[in-house]
Amino acid sequence: MKSLIIDNYDSYTYNLFQLIGKVSGIEPLVIKNDEMTYDEILNLDFDNVIISPGPGSPDKAKDFGVCREIIEKLDKPILGICLGHQGIYYYHGGEVVRAKEPMHGRQSPVIHNGKGIFKGIKNNFIVTRYHSLTCEDKELDDIKIDARTSDGIVMGISHKTKPIYGLQFHPESIASDCGEELIKNFINITRDFYNKNQLAYEIIDKDFDTGNLYEMLYEYDDKTLWLDSSKVEEGLSRFSIFGLQGEKRGHTIKYDVNNKIVEKTFVNSDKKEVFEENIFYYLKANRPRCEYDENLPFDFQLGYIGYFGYELKKDTENVVNKYSYSYPDAYLKYCDRALVYDHMEGKLYLLSYKDDLEWKEDIKNLLNKEIIINKEETRRDFPKLKFVKDKKTYTEDILKIKDLIRAGETYEVCLTNRLDIFDKIDGKNYYMELRDKSPGQYSAFLPLDELKIASSSMERFLRVDKNKIVSTKPIKGTIKRGESKEEDERLIEELRSEEKTMSENLMIVDLLRNDLGKFCEIGSVEVPKLMDVETYKTLHQLVTTVSGKIKDDVDIIEVLEKTFPGGSMTGAPKKRTLEIIDELETYPRGVYSGTIGYISNNSTMDFNIVIRTALIEEDKATIGVGGAIILLSDEEEEFDEIVLKAKGSLLALQSYYNNFDEIDIEGSKN
């Protein structure tokens, strides 16, 4: 267990350094309280924090520096000593006052409750004190008092639910008893903090239809999240993940990018926590962590599932949002329970924490039930469909982009349009049809409050595996399927050899190589597959793979932050092109063009690019479509391509409406 000591300019800090290093066997890190920002500290490698003694008062920024943010934000074990102890009490709402008399280099016996950091410590042990201030003898909403002197001066405190402890005395003093034992207890508390998050899993060796499996889980909990390998391909999409939330640890993170507000809510609770910070900084500091379980054949071992919306470009690329999204800009659910299905081996894994096992019996009973699926029977007339930008406006935008390319403002712009469907659509039923009619390797169904997200994406944005290898699979270049095998082969060859398609793909590949180069080891960024053709029900597409080895000191959240939004949905150069997109498009993209996936406790992650996705609200649904515009683009062909892509997503509605073959999209004709 590696400790970080925040030095409040005290003369005894390196006595603490020696004591902690001796007990833990690992040399601690030491930084001054004004040496680094909180965000910079998050990039350091440490397991717990010791806030040192020091002169002054915790309410003064010059005395306490970054320690306040550590106390208020960090989700790791914290031990405050003397000034650090007072800061913990003060920033949880307590009063720090002058002591009856200053105590410097003086000794006292301590009486304690034998719990937490005092576990196994004899009572009336002798400590050395150096303080003029003291915490009031009063318990707070979140803080309890664990130890006092015989005359009632507070000597030890702890948080009621978090691993945060304070000691008024100096355990590192040569004349203090039990210093090593106290530090050993804190190290054990740190170890328990990480160990309590250990994974428990059970394997059911049985084939399941994952569609039927989700129907059962949805009946059990209609908030169940589904990362669905609806198109199974070895090495790409072998596992499907079903995420659920328990009351003990389940929580939801929503983020408002324009106001930089992170909101954390809890399962079956009115409790809410609000943080005024960037979502990426929040996750670096607060996401749960655990070791990778090598016995499992997949990377997701509990963690966050959800989306990051396109408008997060304000944080990642410093591009002001011209339009604001009406739903959260990021929405993550912490899934402390999950089912993972191995499509290759025909095995179902039930995952949870070791202290949360009872729910699995409910699931196993559920799996033994016969599922009855009630499909929508009544067919009705096709609803009104409308492009936000009609053909005339969209093609005019393409001409504007070409002028900007000629002027040297950009190389390539991913221009998008939005198809609005004006009808009440059942989100789950729509997704079940979508995965059947138009499957994708990186599909998902996320029922999130008023918004249901049904995605059949076949494009991977980012994957980080257990070896810190990052990979991305941009798609650029699309052509329709042929009527015959011979025509199909001809179209594939046309796609491979067309100069425009190759240009589109190369620009994005080089952009993503650049993005990965920001945090990968020198020489490790490679392109193992360049412009492979992948075939789907309605079209062929060109797909490239780019990969690299992440530097040891880079957190996976930084990987996401430094590559978002995905280059295949922006164009290049990225920042200038994002500004151009905001001038041309008249609405926020929201979830579309963002990313859906997971951040696992074990520091792996896997995210798609949000394409082929319906965003379903109460009385309408929207489908985003788009394409890369370069100088070689033909306006008519580009518009035909987005109509083709839209119809791929509309296939899911085929079972519910009459006259499907006569679909008329308002705005799709001159």
Language-model features: where?
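Extreme N-terminal starter segment of soluble prokaryotic enzymes
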Residues: 1-4
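Active-site flanking residues adjacent to catalytic metal/cofactor-binding acidic residues
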Residues: 6-7, 169, 227, 509
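A generic "structured core" feature
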Residues: 22-24, 30-32, 37, 48-51, ...
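Generic structural signal for residues in well-ordered beta-strands
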Residues: 28-30, 96, 145
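Cysteine-nucleophile active-site neighborhood
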Residues: 43-120, 124, 183
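Catalytic beta-strand/loop cores that center a nucleophilic Ser/Cys/Thr
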Residues: 114-162, 594
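Acyltransferase
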Residues: 171-195
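Extended alpha-helical targeting/anchoring segments
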Residues: 195-670
